[in-house]
A protein has these predicted regions:
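Binuclear metal-dependent hydrolase catalytic cores
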Residues: 1-165, 175, 241-271
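DG-centered beta-turn motif at the end of beta-strands
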Residues: 167-169
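Cap/insert and terminal regions of metallo-dependent hydrolase folds
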Residues: 171-262
Length: 271
């Protein structure tokens, strides 16, 4: 996990142990020695260059939606801005616009000095529809989920070894469709929005996010093997996240729950 925050990064001494970068996770498939699929390109994406130890990135990036905290790492992803790099970037399709044009909304002057064409390496920009796809040899299912301010996908990624669902921005209190529960059914690892607490529910509703309790309820409903609490509030300090880690097992009972940390590695295997 390269970035576990939501909305904006969280610098400072109170945010060191869990990390301050915005959302980005890198997936290394069975048989590979390096990540080939990245979910979201928050500020944590910059750290992937260090993980790759000087090598150019050769793989795909899928954005769950187009809010700034999902894209701010792209302009500073050195491993993707190299002559030997290959990057297939998938953005949620909307308004019949091309993937390139969707990216250029924030990745072009005056917002940024260059346009998508200014990136070195072999980049493709793909408008991703909902449904099942094959990306980097992995089965990827994209499904529309409730969130505020533009089309947002929940993603399920799986191979023969196991399955991971990624819903970093989700308002489950707005309703859970039978289609979503079917996509998430029996997932091995559920990475889910847990930005707010029950005492902050009005904020969760207003901004289109979830509470920790929402995440636990969804994990139970879809029979997830492990729940990973993700998309931490930029105001949630290390000590506050430690507190959540201390009380959430009683709430979750027999459901294993992990509080996401920057730099954390998870093995995704069948449960």
């Amino acid at each position: 996990m390269l970035g576990v925050r939501g909305s904006t990064s969280a610098p400072g001494a109170d945010f060191v142990r869990y990390g301050g970068h915005t959302s980005c996770i890198a997936i290394t498939p069975e048989g590979s020695d390096r990540p080939t699929l990245v979910l979201d390109a928050g500020t944590g994406l910059r750290s992937l260059t260090t993980v790759l130890d000087g090598a150019a990135f050769d793989g795909s990036i899928i954005l769950s939606h187009l809010h700034w905290d999902r894209m701010q790492g792209l302009p500073f992803f050195a491993a993707g801005d190299r002559d030997r790099a290959r990057v297939d970037l998938y953005l949620p399709a909307q308004d019949d616009r091309s993937g390139r044009d969707l990216l250029a909304q924030s990745f072009s002057p005056p917002s940024f000095p260059i346009t998508p064409e200014g990136l070195r390496g072999a980049w493709t920009f793909c408008a991703l529809a909902d449904g099942r796809h094959e990306v980097e040899g992995l089965a990827v299912t994209a499904i529309d989920i409730e969130h505020k301010g533009g089309r947002t996908f929940g993603l399920r990624v799986e191979d023969a070894q196991g399955s991971l669902a990624y819903l970093p921005d989700h308002a489950p209190a707005a309703g859970l469709s039978s289609e979503l529960l079917a996509v998430l059914a029996d997932v091995d690892v559920l990475v889910h929005d847990a930005q707010f607490l029950e005492s902050e529910r009005p904020l969760a509703v207003n901004f289109g996010h979830a509470t920790v309790l929402d995440s636990v309820k969804l994990a139970r409903a879809c029979r997830a093997g492990t729940l990973v609490l993700f998309h931490h509030s930029p105001a949630r300090t290390d000590d506050a996240l430690d507190d959540i880690a201390a009380w959430v097992p009683e709430l979750a009972r027999d459901l294993p729950v992990v509080v996401a940390r920057e730099g954390m590695t998870l093995d995704v295997v069948r449960h």
